C-alpha cells in the first residue's frame, strides 16, 4: 500500500509539473519593445498610466503645478491623460529631443550629472519625466515666470512664444472613453 501511495504521489507530481500553467512567451512587436519598460513600472501598465503616475509623483516632488506638467506632456507628445490607451511615449523630434517629455540628451546629462544614453532617455518614462520636472524647477527658480520657463524649455533660450502660451493655458479636461 505504501509503495502504491509513493507511485501515486510521484505520478501526481509529474502530472502537476507537466500541466502547470506557465506564463506564455510575450510576443514583442517593434512598438511594444519601445514602450514596455520593466524597470519603469510593472510590465502590464500601459504607458499612459505610467505617465500619469510619474508626472503626478515628480510634479509633487519638484513643486510643479500639475496642469503645467501635464501641459508640457500634451504639447510635446500629445499626451491626453491616463485613458490615452494608444499613447506612444518613445518619440524622437526632428531636433533630437526624445521620450515623453521631449528632453535633449545633453540637457538630461547636465541636469542629472550622468552619462545617460539616448535610447534610455527615450524609452524610460520614469527617468524622462523626472528629468523634465527637475529641469522645470531649475528654470523656474532662475526665471520666476512660468511663461518664460516654458519658452526656454521649448527653445533653449528664455522667451515667451506660442508654445509657452499653450502650456501656460493648458486645461486638464480629459474624457474617460
Each language-model region and where it sits:
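N-terminal Sec-pathway targeting helices
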Residues: 1-13
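Short hydrophobic alpha-helical membrane-entry/anchor segments
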Residues: 17-26
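Polar low-complexity intrinsically disordered regions enriched in Ser/Thr and small residues
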Residues: 11, 15-16, 102
Amino acid at each position: 500500500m505504501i509503495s502504491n501511495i509513493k507511485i501515486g504521489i510521484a505520478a501526481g507530481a509529474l502530472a502537476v509539473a507537466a500541466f502547470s500553467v506557465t506564463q506564455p512567451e510575450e510576443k514583442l512587436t517593434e512598438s511594444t519593445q519601445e514602450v514596455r519598460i520593466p524597470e519603469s513600472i510593472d510590465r502590464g501598465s500601459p504607458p499612459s498610466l505610467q505617465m500619469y503616475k510619474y508626472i503626478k509623483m515628480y510634479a509633487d516632488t519638484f513643486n510643479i503645478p500639475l496642469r503645467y506638467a501635464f501641459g508640457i506632456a500634451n504639447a510635446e507628445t500629445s499626451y491626453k491623460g491616463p485613458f490615452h490607451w494608444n499613447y506612444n511615449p518613445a518619440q524622437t523630434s526632428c531636433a533630437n529631443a526624445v521620450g515623453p517629455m521631449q528632453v535633449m540628451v545633453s540637457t538630461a546629462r547636465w541636469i542629472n550629472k550622468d552619462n545617460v544614453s539616448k535610447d534610455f532617455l527615450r524609452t524610460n518614462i520614469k527617468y524622462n519625466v523626472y528629468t523634465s520636472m527637475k529641469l522645470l524647477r531649475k528654470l523656474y527658480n532662475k526665471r520666476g515666470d512660468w511663461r518664460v520657463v516654458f519658452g526656454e524649455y521649448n527653445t533653449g533660450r528664455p522667451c515667451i512664444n506660442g508654445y509657452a502660451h499653450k502650456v501656460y493655458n493648458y486645461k486638464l479636461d480629459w474624457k474617460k472613453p
